[in-house]
Amino acid sequence: MTHFETRPLCSLNSPLLCGFFPIKLAVLLVQLIAIVIQFCMLYYNGNQEEIVFVAMVLLLVFTISSFVAFLGEYGTMMAIHYYVSCILLIWPAVVFIMKLISLCNKLFIEENATSRDAKDFMKITAILFAVIFYIWMCLQLIRVAKSRLILPRFTIRSN
């Protein structure tokens, strides 16, 4: 008996970062690290206020569902993760702008800037660029997933 199954063409292929490192692996690795960090935060900071605890649990559920979405290449869930990440990018961008204004104020007006101020600014700059780079990698995976063809796979079952 024969039947057709649909499957994504080249579902295991991923765009490459620097020509040799799969973007999908990098995204999954970042998400896995985020899941571990969030579990640790819940474990060690479990006695927080109820609203903070609920927010941390919801963020953990979102991160786990995003991991499953990128692992299984579920386009809709990947897109939801992308858009939520773009919205959450507002937070590091606001902190970056605040640190930039503070550093400029200390450099040019108060003239008492320290190396700690510069280090804080560099940290938030690195975090902001890392988040932007992560979102860009997610977008690349979404574009590849949308451009894949769904081809039938012919299988033969023998009784």
Curated annotation (Swiss-Prot):
InterPro entries in alphabetical order: DUF5373
Protein name as catalogued: Uncharacterized protein C48B4.7
Taxon lineage: Eukaryota, Metazoa, Ecdysozoa, Nematoda, Chromadorea
